Amino acid sequence: MNATPAPVTILTGFLGSGKTTLLNHILREAHGQRIAVIENEFAEAGVDAELIFRNGAEQIVVMNNCCICCTVRGDLIRILDDLADRKAKGELGYDRVVIETTGLADPAPVAQTFVADELVKARFRLDGVVTMVDAANAGWQLNHHREAQAQVGFADRLLISKSDLVGDDELAALRHRLRGVNARAPQRIVEHGRAEIGDVLDVRGFDLDAVLQIDPEFHEDRHSHQHDHVGSFVYRSRRPFDRLRLEQFMAGAMHEIGQRLLRCKGIVAFRGDRNRVVFQGVQKTLTAAAERLWRPTEKRESVLVFVGHDLPEERMREGLRRCLAR
């Protein structure tokens, strides 16, 4: 029997936002879970890994002098495979994995690993992306660094640190700006890395049912957010889609938009299909799988969420409308 895939949390955030402090808090908490940590540092000599509370981590793997968001994603796959192999042999025990990215990482390609690689998907399940936001410096970072925008736009949770260093008005303005970039991610204030475990682990960010339960406004396609250069929009329809037309449109859109599309996810109803189909896309990789049958008491409604850099929203909405069954 195949083991249940281990949940994975991607912990990201710009330089100095407090990721390692948060990770130490999680490792010290008495939650009873064994955590394997993959620590990515953009330097030959790892410093952050030396600051991690080692007794709380089952295994710490350090990836030095590289950024897992770009050229060495293959190294990440090899590390994950090694962790899974050692667990299967009884050499290592862990319940979940936390990947702490470098502050300069775009989390989208990291998440893509768990969508595109079949062996990784069989052994690991991406639970969510948690982004730390430095309240004192986030405004400047969002203005000057595309990576900071991507980290906020891709998040399933936004944890705001250093709020004690700014005034109430400045904090309120930042939270408003963050909602503009990513209205779907709940925001939490974190003091000295002390976050609720449920805000970091088991966020179920890639579980569409969980999203619908947590955020009933997720269904509302009136919400459109285009601030900074990262934005999101939601498309919904009670009319079923034509499968061939939608697949062709999505393939063309992902080819045209490319890496500007950070993430898409959704639940789709197709004409003539009793299955509820789940779409997950990260950059140029798209998967679609029948999740289960639509329930008789369930409203058959398609909901698609798109997050990306300068997305052509109106053109995409029109394209999606043309994919509806006639």
List where the protein language model places each region.
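Residue-level signal for alpha-helical context at structural boundaries
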Residues: 40-41, 56, 94, 128, ...
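Non-catalytic interfacial helical region
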Residues: 109-119, 133-148, 152, 160, ...
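C-terminal accessory "lid"/substrate-recognition subdomains
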Residues: 2, 150, 154-302, 309-326
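A generic "cationic amphipathic patch" detector
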Residues: 28, 35-36, 89, 110, ...
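Nucleotide-state-sensitive switch-loop elements of NTP-binding domains
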Residues: 2-17, 21-141
